[in-house]
Amino acid sequence: MSTEKLEASEEPQAPLANTSETNSIKGDTENIVTVFDLANEIEKSLKDVQRQMKENDDEFSRSIQAIEDKLNKMSR
């Protein structure tokens, strides 16, 4: 079989990818979430939870202290 026929083929070749598909892929890169983005969101969420837990703990400690103070006053 001769390769001349393959090289000189007049048949139009289909593109490997549709140009509208490649354009939409380029536009979709803005919507891609990276592992770094996820790690940052998780870290931010954990810090928010930690801050809220500290605030709750401080409020609870103040409440316990107030109860103890009242009990001490009553026992005198």
Swiss-Prot record:
<protein>
    <recommendedName>
        <fullName>Uncharacterized protein YOR304C-A</fullName>
    </recommendedName>
</protein>
<feature type="compositionally biased region" description="Polar residues">
    <location>
        <begin position="16"/>
        <end position="26"/>
    </location>
</feature>
<dbReference type="GO" id="GO:0005935">
    <property type="term" value="C:cellular bud neck"/>
</dbReference>
<dbReference type="GO" id="GO:0005934">
    <property type="term" value="C:cellular bud tip"/>
</dbReference>
<feature type="region of interest" description="Disordered">
    <location>
        <begin position="1"/>
        <end position="28"/>
    </location>
</feature>
<dbReference type="GO" id="GO:0043332">
    <property type="term" value="C:mating projection tip"/>
</dbReference>
<dbReference type="GO" id="GO:0005933">
    <property type="term" value="C:cellular bud"/>
</dbReference>
<dbReference type="GO" id="GO:0005737">
    <property type="term" value="C:cytoplasm"/>
</dbReference>
<dbReference type="GO" id="GO:0051017">
    <property type="term" value="P:actin filament bundle assembly"/>
</dbReference>
<keyword id="KW-0963">Cytoplasm</keyword>
